[in-house]
Amino acid sequence: MNMPSWLIFLLTGWTFCGNFFACGGLDYDYPNYENEEEKNEAIDYKDPCKAVVFWGDIALDEEDLKMFHIDRTIDLTQHSNEKLGHTTGGLEEHDLSKKRGALYQLIERIRRFGSGQENTTANSQKVDNNQSGKSKKIRIPRAATSRTERIWPGGVIPYVIGGNFTGSQRAMFKQAMRHWEKHTCVTFIERTDEESYIVFTYRPCGCCSYVGRRGNGPQAISIGKNCDKFGIVVHELGHVIGFWHEHTRPDRDDHVTIIRENIQPGQEYNFLKMEPGEVHSLGESYDFDSIMHYARNTFSRGMFLDTILPSRDENGLRPPIGQRTRLSKGDIAQARKLYRCPACGETLQESTGNFSSPGFPNGYPSYTHCIWRISVTPGEKIVLNFTTMDLYKSSLCWYDYIEVRDGYWKKSPLLGRFCGDKLPDVLTSTDSRMWIEFRSSSNWVGKGFAAVYEAICGGEIHKDAGQIQSPNYPDDYRPLKECVWKITVAENYNVGLTFQAFEIERHDNCAYDYLEVRDGSSENSPLIGHFCGYDKPEDIRSTSNTLWMKFVSDGTVNKAGFAANFLKEEDECARPDNGGCEQRCVNTLGSYKCSCDPGYELAPDKKSCEAACGGLLTKLNGTITTPAWPKEYPPNKNCVWQVVAPSQYRISMKFDYFELEGNEVCKYDYVEVRSGLSSDSKLHGKFCGTEVPEVITSQFNNMRIEFKSDNTVSKKGFRAHFFSDKDECSKDNGGCQHECINTIGSYVCQCRNGFVLHDNKHDCKEAECEHRIHSSNGVITSPNWPDKYPSRKECTWEISATPGHRVKLSFSEFEIEQHQECAYDHLEVFDGETEKSSILGRLCGSKVPEPLVATGNEMFIRFVSDASVQRKGFQATHSTECGGRLKAEAKPRDLFSHAQFGDNNYPVQADCEWILMTERGLRIELNFQTFEVEEEADCGYDFMELFDGHDASAMRLGRFCGSGPPEEIVSTGDAVLIHFHTDDTISKKGFHIRYRSVKYQDILHTK
């Protein structure tokens, strides 16, 4: 039987009524992040995390169990209940008794179903034979009929991205969707008013998605912790489109071997497979390369133990499985069959391109059907120009024709239907998508047609809502672009603009690349903002129904750009009833909210106000405490203190005691400190837990402190005192040439990198540029950063890190004069303490280099500029990586467990390997100066292992934890492998080893 490449969701059987979803499925470890989404997430979607039981990463109810073939060699009664939900954590939403009850129901039903397979088949034949006898075909109750309601109509999938994702995550989601669009005829569109759509959310079950379209409302695709990787999102979208995992297909045993003894206890059920009658074969062979296939070591007892072993190919090689980088050829072929994509046509995503009828210019075949989808960046328009047109001409273009539609699919507005030999006029879309369909049904032979298109950015937009993105978003914008948009919404409304992502080349004055926004319809309208850098601009609201935007990029550094939504906006607070608010009404884009005067808080109706803690404080210093201090604070409190000092003063807040209910994102009880008096002022921090915050100093002469508690756990609270200090730097920069640093009672001037302070303590002059760095991490920059580096400058950095740890250099920004051989301005990095060490790289240009890693704990860096062109320079972070190869010599050397040994405990989830080597004939002696590692009877949590050779296959000298080895250890050969592993909980001081090479005779003499 020729089975499909993927287990497609074309489920069958009228008895089926369960809710299925599938997840990423590769061994991710998810803690419980229940309810970690933003509180303003108001979409009532179908949540894939709420399942009775899980089949690995697929949710099942009792009826769903009929879908799967059960291999009776698996004894599901041996499963460990505690292991359920390993990859997704979905069962953590139920208490343990519910887990166990559901599991045993699953086990019992699977066992009954597995043992009754033969009878089921016999009974089905008997039922068929009792029918009229006109049909000779054997009918199985769960026949292989397609569930068409699970296919997205027209291949169009509307989506919404939740508000709790960063700009880079949103860009990556869009890249993943464009990847599917590029290779198939599936189309993802931002949801407007569609009833059924997907919602990208952050859910506690990690990487999760339903399989296919659920219908009757939104459905979630969960991108949880550690899931925000391109390949994982492409995989999850595969489930949305309608695919199961490859390794569960019925004929998988012909292609892979399941090695059960290597499977983690309690996880054997993840390797069950589906019934042949439950999937629809589309003629595709087993696809080892599928992005929907599990890896070889999924749910393995050990990293290097296989659980799924692919069969050897004709060359005797085992194909790789479990890739998460891109769609395979089989993935693409199967998706195109599932959605019945025409064999002719494609999705065009470049800014310019061309296409033509099949066989052009030698004639097109009859009965041809082609579809081209042009998709460019939102905010761009498509200009389509036919350069040749030679089709059979008929009345109303009935037979052979080409149709162009202004949108993403066949129901979009028609721009024109063409045939004959007359060239159509140039066609321009109103948005960023265009749909072109070609059909032929005559036997007439003509050349066909050819067309070219171009994406143009900017233009006039007359819509009440939409999206604008920089050219080529979510990829880097193109150089030398200038785009101007004029947005017009309905009369008597304003234009609201909110940014989802923002990353434009940074410059103090936004001189290179920038986005300019003006309050009106022209470049002469009042300026709202001139934006660049990586911080998202605040929401923008025009004063009329028009907004003018201009994006400019120069010819050098290109970034990801921006994505923004616009909408028609009204001020609900301007209504006569003040929006129904008792005291204050705060207008927001697309909505509004009520707030209260200081000393009051919102009542449960969210409209009226009642007395609260907090208030307006105008003293130069004072104390703030939580309600009921020093007793536990009450539940459901909202306190706002507004502290105001005289002009040119700054306010500092110091917490003396701090104890609030805590979690990682401070979503229950917390205190927020802001510069300014409003709730949307600059946030200095959101604090909870028991760690006392650092001293906070306001940017201006006012500060807002807000405390909130929920209705559950209460703690002692906090006590803080504030004091005000005059900021001499706020006026004329304190007279400093470069930077002014305010201090309590005074101020100091500070110079940028490459300069020193003049004797007058205000001016800066060029300095010697030699740096010696002995810290494990930090930041280095070119002189005068972030302004252009000076000419004729040479700077050096000698970085020395903790012994046993390699120096790593990572660049965040880079712009040095370009030359093919970096002969002019350049940056050199050497693998050692001087420029005589081997070179790791000689760098110039505007492309950010890949990270550079030294082989040891020293790195030498030299920057040189000539007398001509100056650029922005570079900014880089130096850090350390543990492990590496170290040479043991007669003189003792040191090795430390972690780079911050002595200052901090070792980090969690560390995994480091050092190979100590010496000359042939010598041995290596290890003396433990310090050893303090989490203790456990079998050293199963944190430990250090020693192997008497170059790798872990050598004889193990011991596994140590607690206080370590009782005495020094000597190898029997010229190499020792040290392996240090920590788990994700308790950490200790670590270890300090002093090692050297010794002669065997010396050891005997010493002993």
From Swiss-Prot:
Proregion residues excised on maturation: 26-142
Biased composition (Polar residues): 116-133
Entry GO CC: extracellular region
SUPFAM superfamilies xref list: EGF/Laminin, Metalloproteases ('zincins'), catalytic domain, Spermadhesin, CUB domain
Subcellular location as annotated: Secreted
GO BP annotations listed: cell differentiation; proteolysis
GO molecular function: calcium ion binding; metalloendopeptidase activity; zinc ion binding
Protein name per Swiss-Prot or TrEMBL: Tolloid-like protein 1
Organism: Xenopus laevis
